[in-house]
Each structure stands twice: as C-alpha cells, then as structure tokens.
Amino acid sequence: VDALKDSGAKRFMLPDTLGILNPQLTAAFMSMMCSRYPDLHFDFHAHNDYDLAPGNVLAAVLAGCRGVHTAVNGVGERAGNAALSSVQAILKDHAHVRTNIREENLGKVSTTVESMSGIAIPPNEPIVGENVFTQVAGVHADGDKKNNLYCNDLLPERFGRKREYALG
C-alpha cells in the first residue's frame, strides 16, 4: 500500500477473497488500515463462504470503510458475494448510511437477475425471498393485528412488497 500510495493511488479495494473473515477480524483489519492511512479511500469486497458477507460489510463500514462491493442476489463465485439487498438494509438500519438505492426496486432487480442468470432466489432470502414477508397464523400475525406490536424496520412496503398471511 505504501508504494502505491507514494505513486498517487488514493483508492484501494481490500478483499476477503476466500470468504474466511468474520466481523471481528474484518473490523480489526479495516480499522488498522484506516488508522494507518487516514487519507486513503478503502473499499471492502466480501465473499460469503461462511455466510458472513453482509455482517462483514457492516463491520468494515463501522470501522471506516468508505465503499463496498455487492452483487444482486449475492451472485458470485463459490458461495457468492454480499447481497445488495441485504447490505442496503443492514447499512441503512444498523449504520445509518444513506445510499442512492431505491429500495422499492430491489425485488424487481432481483427477479430480473434470477430469470437471466438461472440462479433461483431462495424463498427465505432476506428482503427479496418469496416468503420473507409472509406471516403464518400465530404469534407474529397476532402482533400485526395489535397495532404492529412486533414492529421492526423491515416492513414489506419499504421494499415494494406486501405482507401476506398463510395458514400453517
């Protein structure tokens, strides 16, 4: 990094190429790099081999990372990359980061990529999965009826979706 910085480079991509980091290691590494090189812009590129990519992105941003790499539906080699929809929701809700992403279009973009790539979106995929905003009759559905007793920021309308109910 020192040699590249001295030659004029100002932006660096720090990858977790093998997807082996966890949020604690990601935060420590990013914090060290941002402290050592406060004038540089660091991006983080996470792979999802341990299903930790979105959490690692959050850790990187909280530690000073200024850019992140994502993929629609997490599509990427091996276990994929950090899913755009998950990262958007996490960064907005947990790090109060503003982006120019129009959340109400994430579902449409995801289904377009699904149909063009042939890679199915799991029904329980956060934000964009078919069943994510479906409540089964019971405690959760009852909470919806009680003036959103079990309220959270992941409302289906935010993502251009509607709450559905199923008998189970």
Question: Which residues are covered by each model-predicted region?
Answer:
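Alpha/beta enzyme core
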Residues: 1-40, 58-65
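C-terminal helical cap(s) of enzyme catalytic domains, especially alpha/beta-barrels
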Residues: 76-106, 110
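A mid-to-C-terminal "edge-of-domain" accessory segment
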Residues: 96-168
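Hydrophobic faces of well-ordered beta-strands that scaffold small-molecule active sites
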Residues: 12-14, 40-46, 68-70, 87
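Glycine-rich phosphate-binding active-site loops on the catalytic face of alpha/beta enzymes
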Residues: 16, 63-80
